[in-house]
């Protein structure tokens, strides 16, 4: 019997990150997956990052995880989302070549010391007296370990739906995990069903590209990994088109044939990634919905039409696709489908992602009720690090909400649970002004160095960056000017006699940065990346104290009673999701409202303000 410290089941994004993290920590690790080609597969959209999600990728990278490096290797278009807004809510995103990503993932796994790849089907968890002991494979061979990480994605009792047709599978061309799912039942884990979906894949040559608006990447691409500066692969454009009233008519007339609207699906789907059927029904007043046509790779014939996931029959899929501009002669190479799967209520987990009632069993990814590669990878990292620490007899890691988006997600999952697939948004974080994508390394890399998961290359690069940053920060804070001196240099500020440091001037967006840098012959020579970081820190420095006070105020006001007749529908600042859940739960206090799934700090602040205003009026 082969013996390991940690066994990871599943080679998707959570599994790869978990296995790599455990191995980096120096424990003997096995990654069990059915096929070598499964490693790093992008089952749905060919992209990494986005709003909130890009923050997670940066945090993974700061702890020497691999998703950011893989995305940089396979990225064929890079865009910084929300570029016109503040850095706190900007999100790096990359269109990825599926084949390049999968190849890079397999290569990085093969090259990791202390990590063994085992090809086979996981059939049964072995345990005795409340402790995991190992894993039995479908060929009856056994692997021994006291720490096992389940990263099964959509494969636990996975069921694909295309119209009236259903079959067992976790994704197109794959199988499902029935025997492993059966071995979980005696553990009395709180199980539920969720669903996700994917659109049909269209042959590239059947699209009329010339009739469509092209969307190129950024001229100055922003990489995910702090170790990279430029893309490795050639860059391409995507295209944009839209549905129309004819598209919507075809869908409405065939809703009964949709697996979801025909009553064949029990699982709850992701609220913020609705199927095209959902869009047509829920947003009946909209005449069109945007579709991004995303190439699946440099040499791939397939295009991913982002925005039209579906469970309609194949003939209806073809009909509505061909009603869309640019797709009039489209050929579908693979139909869209919905997939249902088992998940575990994450409230059954500790913050380490270890199951509370079975020592040594960790869960990560979609099995915990999340959706998205990035959320899965971040959980994989947490589970991998904690499984390794447990194997070493060390204390578990705790990621706090004030420290990282990873901490926000883990806390949301393990304290609030999920009733629908969980997706990360910047609005979920109380401290989002300080939890930015640009400073993830400053927040987390020292932490990673302390626990031992950061390699020498990153340690050296981070040390050099912080040496240069600290020198620039010290210089910017020590050099100051009077209003008169600034006026002579063409910079006008209030003539109040107060000296202003270069750091304070960088925070004033109305003053061109070049003018500020020209004031000092040392600062102007600094690396542009260091200056960008310095300017961003200066900008948010004035707000972070207020952010902390706001968060503390909410904590102090948790006992505030919410009137039974409180009208949530009248609050224009609340999302429809929160209005529905607040009306459903009718929380008695602000603390009870805070524990509702999907609740945000901004929503709590709004509710508190309305209650206070009402109290003042009645006084």
Curated annotation (Swiss-Prot):
Its cofactor is FAD. Coiled coil: none annotated. SUPFAM superfamilies: FAD/NAD(P)-binding domain. One of its GO terms (biological process) is tRNA methylation. Its main location: cytoplasm. GO terms for molecular function: flavin adenine dinucleotide binding. It is found in: Cytoplasm. NAD-binding protein involved in the addition of a carboxymethylaminomethyl (cmnm) group at the wobble position (U34) of certain tRNAs, forming tRNA-cmnm(5)s(2)U34. This is tRNA uridine 5-carboxymethylaminomethyl modification enzyme MnmG. It comes from Paracoccus denitrificans (strain Pd 1222). The gene is mnmG.
